[in-house]
């Protein structure tokens, strides 16, 4: 078992592709954060105020159920966490993952995929969810075509996890 877990949520496979690239390069274990009820195209229509994703993101207490239980995190030192940016932050299903386990003593390295939006205050939000006993590193927005070389340069900046 690797000391690193790449956990990701991907609605359109963009984040999945980046997560798989990272897991392969870092020889990390991988876990897909999958909602119990998959999102449809209609659920993801951000222009529709009644769309499932819009309703979920408007409710700070919304924690959609996950299809699988979070893996036992005790053996992992580092969690590389990937997700798309929705409404300027991590999707509610990622919050479900973050509240489903104890992240004390873990290093969390977030990355997001987005057509243009950056991380904003997402890292602060994640830190507030997991608590002060976990260390959330500065996140980064990446495109679907990001090179592993670029990711390695970013990762190498985090001395604690190497």
How would you label these PLM feature ranges?
Residues 1-81, 88-90, 95, 99, ...:
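N-terminal beta1-alpha1-beta2 submodule of the flavodoxin-like/Rossmannoid cofactor-binding fold
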Residues 33-37, 57-62, 107-110, 125, ...:
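Short, surface-exposed, polar/charged, turn-prone segments marking secondary-structure boundaries
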Residues 80, 103, 114:
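Short glycine/serine/threonine-biased micro-segments
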Residues 11-12, 84-86, 115-116, 144:
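Short beta->alpha junction loops/turns
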Residues 100-106:
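Conserved helix-turn-beta segment immediately C-terminal to the redox Cys motif
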Residues 109-146:
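Short, glycine-/small-residue-rich phosphate/pyrophosphate-handling segment
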């Amino acid at each position: 078992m690797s000391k690193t877990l790449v956990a990701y949520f991907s609605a359109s496979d963009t984040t999945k592709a980046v997560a798989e690239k990272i897991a392969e390069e870092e020889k990390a274990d991988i876990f897909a954060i999958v909602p119990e009820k998959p999102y449809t195209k209609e659920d993801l229509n951000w222009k529709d105020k009644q769309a499932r994703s819009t309703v979920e993101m408007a409710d700070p207490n919304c924690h959609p159920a996950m299809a699988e239980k979070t893996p036992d995190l005790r053996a992992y030192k580092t969690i590389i966490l990937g997700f798309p940016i929705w409404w300027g932050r991590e999707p509610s299903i990622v919050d479900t993952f973050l509240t489903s386990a104890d992240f004390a003593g873990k290093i969390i390295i977030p990355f997001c995929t987005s057509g243009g939006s950056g991380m904003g205050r997402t890292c602060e939000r994640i830190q507030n969810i997991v608590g002060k006993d976990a260390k959330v590193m500065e996140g980064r927005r990446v495109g679907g075509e990001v090179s592993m070389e670029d990711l390695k340069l970013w990762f190498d900046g985090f001395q604690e996890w190497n």
